[in-house]
From Swiss-Prot:
It is found in: Late endosome membrane; Midbody; Cytoplasm, Cytoskeleton, Spindle. Residues 84-96 have a biased composition (Basic and acidic residues). Residues 1-84 are annotated as: Interaction with CHMP1B. Its main location: membrane. Proposed to be monomeric or homodimeric in nucleotide-free form and to oligomerize upon binding to ATP to form two stacked hexameric or heptameric rings with a central pore through which ESCRT-III substrates are translocated in an ATP-dependent manner. Interacts with CHMP1A, CHMP1B, CHMP2A, CHMP2B, CHMP3, CHMP4A, CHMP4B, CHMP4C and CHMP6. Interacts with VPS4B; the interaction suggests a heteromeric assembly with VPS4B. Interacts with SPAST. Interacts with IST1. Interacts with ZFYVE19/ANCHR; leading to retain it at midbody. Ubiquitously expressed. Changing residue 13 to D: Abolishes interaction with CHMP6, no effect on interaction with CHMP1A. Its EC number is 3.6.4.6. This is Vacuolar protein sorting-associated protein 4A. It is a peripheral membrane protein. Changing residue 64 to D: Modestly reduces interaction with CHMP6. Changing residue 284 to W: In CIMDAG; has a dominant negative effect on the regulation of endosomal size resulting in enlarged endosomal vacuoles; patient cells also have abnormal nuclear envelope morphology and primary cilium defects; no effect on protein abundance in patient cells; patient-derived induced erythroblasts show defective cytokinesis. The keyword Membrane applies.
Amino acid sequence: MTTSTLQKAIDLVTKATEEDKAKNYEEALRLYQHAVEYFLHAIKYEAHSDKAKESIRAKCVQYLDRAEKLKDYLRSKEKHGKKPVKENQSEGKGSDSDSEGDNPEKKKLQEQLMGAVVMEKPNIRWNDVAGLEGAKEALKEAVILPIKFPHLFTGKRTPWRGILLFGPPGTGKSYLAKAVATEANNSTFFSVSSSDLMSKWLGESEKLVKNLFELARQHKPSIIFIDEVDSLCGSRNENESEAARRIKTEFLVQMQGVGNNNDGTLVLGATNIPWVLDSAIRRRFEKRIYIPLPEEAARAQMFRLHLGSTPHNLTDANIHELARKTEGYSGADISIIVRDSLMQPVRKVQSATHFKKVCGPSRTNPSMMIDDLLTPCSPGDPGAMEMTWMDVPGDKLLEPVVCMSDMLRSLATTRPTVNADDLLKVKKFSEDFGQES
């Protein structure tokens, strides 16, 4: 296997240099990048002596350097008729053309990242988030107060610059971030995921990370929200790719590196699996807030929020009974229960074999009461007419209101999504590194 992997790398490099000489630069770039991947694999798993590793590493640097020059040339070729960079061209000789192409590249990367800026506010207020008072207070401390009362945060009293929200799935971490985007109306809110920062071009991903932070500093006060931060900043290990390692290193440098002033910039991360985060990244998140499963009072509030203005006849006692029965359910689970129960009246209409006339508000003029609306009923009801929903005129249907039996039926068919084992892992992480919300 040693011979085949190393030989494959050598064959690829040979083809790359041939394509390079033939001025097929796109193909040459692709082959150089593939060759480097094979060489790195050989260094990691197959080269046993330090001398062999050093020799392969030196070759990698040489081919990467050529790949970078080809990549710069291919990018700039569309904009200017730029001549190819000679293999033996020195840094000094290429400085003029490099400086010409550098700004457009930076501008292009920043334009790409501008898509991550949340231009429209989500319109979710603190009151729309049930419970999580500790998390809300920490976010107000970090985001709202420094903007409203900047004189409070002078000298050694500085706002938090890195906050990690962690907890089981569906507990409201991303929802809290939306509330921050709404409430921090003077801040620029960047919402990024791994897809915004990953690139097929070698070396471009870390440039995107760097430009993201530069863009945030230019538009401060700003918030960078990274959902599922574990996908970008997992623990460093032997098996990860060079690109992943470089992205992680750039994150570390930008979040708290020498020469980077992040005043007015908050990095807000969210994850369901905090135990896989790299320890250095974990340290950069100064405040680590555990977002637990909702307590009974918060669950009751969630039922009310999700029911909203939909017609229903549930009493406070019914709501509290539902809250008691949903121990171990996340906010997302409760949302699904309510959404399913709101569909129960529609299912009653679909399955009904009899309808009866009732009095209710007109569809065209809700202030006017009319007495010829039709609603589903049992065959034994007085005035029951045998018909299906297909026979009911579109403006004459009065759907049943949501009732407790609808909620219980939906609850019986919806199981909690949070696994007991995962919950134990999150609680263990919270005991070791977190703060309760």
